[in-house]
Amino acid sequence: MIDEILFEAEERMTATVEHTREDLTTIRTGRANPAMFNGVMAEYYGVPTPITQMSGITVPEPRMLLIKPYEMSSMQVIENAIRNSDLGVNPTNDGQVLRVTIPQLTEERRKDMVKLAKGKGEDGKIAIRNIRRKGMDQLKKLQKDGDAGEDEVQAAEKELDKVTAGFVAQVDEVVARKEKELMEV
């Protein structure tokens, strides 16, 4: 039972780190990255659909993205979705593909993005700590119900603390990498 609690906590912490990593990819860095369009939705036959599922997105240059819709009829819809998104980019339509030039971030905007990245990292660390707390509560309940001895529970708590510290460090590392990427000119 103790192993199940530790395993479940570790699985959820892994998912949290991955979610934080994905969350950070949506922050614009001034470099072309197809992942920046992950949250952009467009109407596709009346259904809101991510534009990443409606088109192929490539990076021909460090500051440019090419978006080639799978169906040419959806070109205008995708273009409008990008324009109306909060990404701050303006696509140009040449009839075959949409070209999106990524403007260089100002120093002030970069600092705002770093704050945003730190906030998302902090959210990830809070989620990891909440998973730890839930695991600790489950371990204490096992001990209280008599299903596990005090020594076993203490050893499991130490293990859970060690695992938690490792995952918090992973989140810190992911945020630090994003910060470095954001501050590069």
From Swiss-Prot:
The keyword Cytoplasm applies. It comes from Corynebacterium glutamicum (strain ATCC 13032 / DSM 20300 / JCM 1318 / BCRC 11384 / CCUG 27702 / LMG 3730 / NBRC 12168 / NCIMB 10025 / NRRL B-2784 / 534). GO terms for biological process: translational termination. Keywords: Cytoplasm, Protein biosynthesis. One of its GO terms (molecular function) is ribosomal large subunit binding. This is Ribosome-recycling factor. Responsible for the release of ribosomes from messenger RNA at the termination of protein biosynthesis. May increase the efficiency of translation by recycling ribosomes from one round of translation to another. Belongs to the RRF family. CDD domains: RRF (cd00520). Pfam families: RRF. GO terms for cellular component: cytoplasm. InterPro entries: Ribosome_recyc_fac, Ribosome_recyc_fac_dom, RRF_sf. It is found in: Cytoplasm.
